[in-house]
Amino acid sequence: MKVLINKNELNKILKKLNNVIVSNNKMKPYHSYLLIEATEKEINFYANNEYFSAKCTLAENIDVLEEGEVIVKGKIFSELINGIKEDIITIQEKDQTLLVKTKKTNINLNTIDKKEFPRIRFNQNVDLKEFDELKIQHSLLTKGLKKIAHAVSTFRESTRKFNGVNFNGSNGKQIFLEASDSYKLSVYEIKQKTDPFNFIVETNLLSFINSFNPEGGDLISIFFRKEHKDDLSTELLIKLDNFLINYTSINESFPRVMQLFDFEPETKVTIQKNELKDALQRILTLAQNERFFLCDMQVTNSHLKINSNVQNIGASLEEVTCLKFEGHKLNIAVNALSLLEHIDSFDTDEIELYFQGSNKYFLISSNNEPELKEILVPSK
């Protein structure tokens, strides 16, 4: 293999693939490598991790002098390319070594036998007619994902459904992005008619998708089909710019959460988001940002009164003004960080809290941002 390639174009690809490569996985070392494949008219780059595989194709600003393929350490190769100043780079495979050359630089990198890492390349020669296709605006998708990402479980659950986002298009009229750790729930609605579908995508892949700033238009294509072998998984192929991403979603049943929003509240209050946010941040500072710190919240017709007590450090009382109040007074215990993450995902300043009582989950929403709804379970 021997190719001439523009350094800036190569650098852009490698920066993206660095988000795929895992450099310190001793159990699965092939996750730290990058496969470079030169064909007559293009160069393909492959990388994978335990969650998904990615292929990037470059067909411009290249000159393929000799076809071939080579596997190298991904992070090291990326850092070396980033440090080169010249615009044109020669990459050549020779005697199980990768030569990286410019007018002023000559680098030899050891390569790996391709037979040792058969899973680094996924089968992209599939008939897309066998797949259903979902086209969605990348900007709208990433906006929704960023708003609900905090609700995804940060623990590696025995069931993977809480380690990702559920794409719920089951009614064919909207797409609901749903995330939960079983204590908090966030749902973002995208108004778009589709054929019915439902699948879960791990946050590792969603973070990779969020890292893109599409150059070829704002649409992202997600092709999906249930695996015919067992119906226990759904195969996804995602096209974004010159990247093709392969992912297998395990068909676990995500809870039916939309019905949770349909209740008659006993108490409803309207508050300024930033006032509550500032109060919670002070409480968490006192609690030294303890993730599971609980505080008591008294809901009155004039204020939310939030009491917190940190052993051996101190105590605080925060009062947040109620702009509107309907219903009954109540006391409820909440996780301070979870409540902060929930309200901070809203862009609007006024938010509404809907309570069913002291021992039931409550709803957080905004009339100015109706596409986002969140639920928090009280703590005991």
Swiss-Prot record:
InterPro entries: DNA_clamp_sf (IPR046938), DNA_polIII_beta (IPR001001), DNA_polIII_beta_C (IPR022635), DNA_polIII_beta_N (IPR022634). GO terms for molecular function: 3'-5' exonuclease activity; DNA binding; DNA-directed DNA polymerase activity. GO terms for biological process: DNA strand elongation involved in DNA replication. It comes from the Bacteria. It is found in: Cytoplasm. Keywords: Cytoplasm, DNA replication, DNA-binding, DNA-directed DNA polymerase, Nucleotidyltransferase, Transferase. One of its GO terms (cellular component) is DNA polymerase III complex. The keyword Transferase applies. The keyword Cell wall biogenesis/degradation does not apply. Belongs to the beta sliding clamp family. Confers DNA tethering and processivity to DNA polymerases and other proteins. Acts as a clamp, forming a ring around DNA (a reaction catalyzed by the clamp-loading complex) which diffuses in an ATP-independent manner freely and bidirectionally along dsDNA. Initially characterized for its ability to contact the catalytic subunit of DNA polymerase III (Pol III), a complex, multichain enzyme responsible for most of the replicative synthesis in bacteria; Pol III exhibits 3'-5' exonuclease proofreading activity. Forms a ring-shaped head-to-tail homodimer around DNA which binds and tethers DNA polymerases and other proteins to the DNA. The DNA replisome complex has a single clamp-loading complex (3 tau and 1 each of delta, delta', psi and chi subunits) which binds 3 Pol III cores (1 core on the leading strand and 2 on the lagging strand) each with a beta sliding clamp dimer. Additional proteins in the replisome are other copies of gamma, psi and chi, Ssb, DNA helicase and RNA primase. This is Beta sliding clamp. The gene is dnaN.
